[in-house]
Amino acid sequence: EQSDHDIRIKAHVNQIGDVEAPEVSFEEMCEHAEDNEVRCGHPETAARMRELIDEYQEAGDSIGGSIAFEVRGVPRGLGAPRFDSFPSRLGQAMFSIPATTHVEFGLGADARTVTGSERNEDWTFDEGDNPETESEAGDPVPVGNDHGGLQGGITTGQPIWGEATWHAPTSIPKEQRTADWETGEIVEDAQVIGRHDPVLPPR
């Protein structure tokens, strides 16, 4: 999607269960994500995801998954170092979506193996020829973007990228064991009747 401020947002389903798509570019997400039911930017993986979803649906069960997202055109300098940081505000919005269990920016959890010197990344001066960034020629910019366009809670002008994960829908037709609050008895064959989504990320 594109806003009035030329901010471009795109996401695609990058994993369903144990079926994971290879990394795809922003352009590939734009080109392929809406071409299939699961909204995966990698067509071959999308077909495998569809098969897996069908398996769980036929069994009356469900499965979790995740999306990869990228935002371009966000001006640098938005956010704050602490309570009003850009990632905390964006994370709050994403965690407001039911069933969200994990949100990460840049390297995310992989940052646990990165040293402080690596995390700092090298800096240089923008030559003014990179359409992906919102900086101008002569501006100081990081050479890489492992931090996901965010440093110290503030936007850098580079693409903001990361992932969000949703657990499997828990309202499923498969019979399960539960406890009846009113009778105080164990129910061995509880079943949820109604419409059931076998997976959430494509939505």
Residues of each region from the PLM?
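Glycine-rich, mobile lid/loop segments that gate access to catalytic sites or pores
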Residues: 1-82
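Structured, active/binding-site neighborhoods that engage oxygen-rich ligands
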Residues: 16, 168-169, 193
